[in-house]
Amino acid sequence: MWLLYLLVPALFCRAGGSIPIPQKLFGEVTSPLFPKPYPNSFETTTVITVPTGYRVKLVFQHFDLEPSEGCFYDYVKISADKKNLGRFCGQLGSPLGNPPGKKEFMSQGNKMLLTFHTDFSNEENGTIMFYKGFLAYYQAVDLDECASQSESGEKDLQPQCQHLCHNYVGGYFCSCRPGYELQEDRHSCQPECSSELYTEASGYISSLEYPRSYPPDLRCNYSIRVERGLTLHLKFLEPFEIDDHQQVHCPYDQLQIYANGKNIGEFCGKQRPPDFDTSSNAVDLLFFTDESGDSRGWKLRYTTEIIKCPQPKTLDEFTVIQNLQPQYQFRDYFIATCKLGYQLIEGNQVLHSFTAVCQDDGTWHRAMPRCKIKDCGQPRNLPNGAFRYTTTMGVNTYKARIQYYCHEPYYKMQTRAGSKESEQGLYTCTAQGIWKNEQKGEKIPRCLPVCGKPVNPVEQRQRIIGGQKAKMGNFPWQVFTNIHGRGGGALLGDRWILTAAHTLYPKEHEAQSNASLDVFLGHTNVEELMKLANHPIRRVSIHPDYRQDESHNFEGDIALLELENSVTLGPNLLPICLPDNETFYDLGLMGYVSGFGVMEEKIAHDLRFVRLPVANRKDCETWLRGKNRLDVFSQNMFCAGHPSLKQDACQGDSGGVFAVRDPNTDRWIATGIVSWGIGCSKGYGFYTKVLNYVDWIKKEMEEED
């Protein structure tokens, strides 16, 4: 209840009749002239009214009236709801009268009547007495219309809610139990259960009036809708009773249950349905009744459980499910990986990772992948080499092994210090799907040309005047050039030509462009060489000390030609080695000079060679002075041959090398380059000392390596 206490101005009463008070929530009522004595021979009735939905509460703050037996002379009479609430007079503590004291007077309705009556005089034992009268406060108090009917007998005070009554300050409203609908009169209820919706995670549902008889002619639809990912469980309680027939199944009344739109049962009779795990978050219960019957109906409790997904199962023995759980439910997930050396495959697509999530319908959002062994693919081809499988031929999957090797004896695998060639060339297909070597990683090895090891080396133990025709494979490094006439050179590695600078830039001639450089390799016959085609030149490098304009100075007479493409080495095409010490220039050491130059004043068609000793430097200097020549003979040159040998390099042999066999390694070394001389077979020949230019040669070759 809500009580409102406030004061308002005093109300003065007049003799005779009734005085209505304007409808307010609170106020006061006084006797005339209060607190002065009230007049004689006075009667009036004050009507106190509060808004509908409230009751009137009245309390006297001050009360001083003439006392009398039975309050016959002066009195205040209070009535409400057609009932007399009392007749009062006197004062608190007087021997006569009936003062109200602090008693609270309460109406059942929104009206209260207060009648004030005085007689013709106020005397006591011949003495005139003065009485102040009364002061009373009233207030509106909320009326609980939903409480039981008062004893006043006023039927309009009792709400006629058929089902449920709800009180509020100043009024009330009616509502109906689930399955019923409030009618237009706002008091009565009629069955209406065609669209009952339940969304809580658990609860109870029953037929109307359960466990009393349900109403006739029902068409009820109870829908349970919970969050996706939950599954509903139904458990029917006792008693279960729906009209039935002994011979026909549920002809009168029936309860139908649907889950996911599918009918999972139709029930009647007295046998309680079994418990249902619907595997659905949506269930509908349809209850139909005919016009008769007195069965008690049904009631169920529904609960929810998070939906579960089936236990994930791998498709092969190589798939691994991380942290496998005993069960998986909605929103759980699992991660699948592969054992070492295998990779995830979904359809035809390679996956880097795999995660599957349990969906709200109890299925995984993607199918289990399979694990396929890693395939490293076909091993890369090794230039100037090949590979062989040390495991199953043609199988390139995880743990497969191959051995790279070079085409010997023409190439040899580059190895690190302290490592073996077999270790350098052994590659394994790793778990990452990459061919890998323990030392070199993914990088494949290199096959380096083997220098100075001809398959068919020259054998010459005697001097032959005018030289000798070379056989195939005697001088496989020999190069035939045709620039400013015939010239020679030697193969270094598989794409460099060592030659004399003056074959490219002859003394007192103009420079020649790369386009006119003709280079041939791989045969001892000129005509056959021409058939093998020219090797294009990518770059020409002339030593900076070479001076084309100084005709008697062949200082720095050395050059390098870089081929556009590497050549493939073989028995007739092999490089020569570079010197690494001065012993290759010891006096009398025999060397070989080969070329396609002039022989007996005729152009040679075949490769020929001569065998010459390294000459004494002083003898060569003396011989030059005897010829009255001003030619420069520097420390970067050496001489070979002897005036008595009648053998020498000649025109067309320039650029070829002076080749010496190293007895310690059995390798052939290019110690010199045919540079200059005086005539052919008429004395000493002069050669560029290659040892003094090895650093320059290596630097030039490394720039493009």
From Swiss-Prot:
Positions bound to Ca(2+) 2: 142-143, 145, 167-168, 171
Primary site of residence: secreted
Sorted UniProt keywords: Autocatalytic cleavage, Calcium, Complement pathway, Disulfide bond, EGF-like domain, Glycoprotein, Hydrolase, Hydroxylation, Immunity, Innate immunity, Metal-binding, Phosphoprotein, Protease, Repeat, Secreted, Serine protease, Signal, Sushi
Domain EGF-like per the UniProt entry, residue ranges: 142-190
Chemical reaction(s) catalysed: Selective cleavage of Lys(or Arg)-|-Ile bond in complement subcomponent C1s to form the active form of C1s (EC 3.4.21.42)
Glycosylation sites: 125, 221, 514, 581
Post-translational modification: Cleaved and activated by autocatalytic processing to generate Complement C1r subcomponent heavy and light chains that are connected by disulfide bonds. The iron and 2-oxoglutarate dependent 3-hydroxylation of aspartate and asparagine is (R) stereospecific within EGF domains.
Residues that hold Ca(2+) 3 according to the record: 243, 253, 290, 294
Residues annotated for Ca(2+) 1 binding in this entry: 66, 74, 119
Ranges for domain CUB: 18-141, 193-305
InterPro entries noted in UniProt: CUB_dom (IPR000859), EGF-like_Ca-bd_dom (IPR001881), EGF-like_dom (IPR000742), EGF_Ca-bd_CS (IPR018097), Pept_S1A_C1r/C1S/mannan-bd (IPR024175), Peptidase_S1_PA (IPR009003), Peptidase_S1_PA_chymotrypsin (IPR043504), Peptidase_S1A (IPR001314)
Record family assignment: Belongs to the peptidase S1 family.
Domains: entry comment: The CUB domain 2 shows a compact folded structure in the presence of Ca(2+), whereas it has a flexible, disordered conformation in the absence of Ca(2+). Ca(2+) could provide a switch between the folded and disordered forms; low Ca(2+) could provide flexibility to promote autoprocessing and activation of CIR.
Subunit structure: Core component of the complement C1 complex, a calcium-dependent complex composed of 1 molecule of the C1Q subcomplex, 2 molecules of C1R and 2 molecules of C1S. The C1Q subcomplex is composed 18 subunits: 3 chains of C1QA, C1QB, and C1QC trimerize to form 6 collagen-like triple helices connected to six globular ligand-recognition modules. Within the C1 complex, C1R is a dimer of identical chains, each of which is activated by cleavage into two chains, heavy and light, connected by disulfide bonds.
Entry protein name: Complement C1r subcomponent
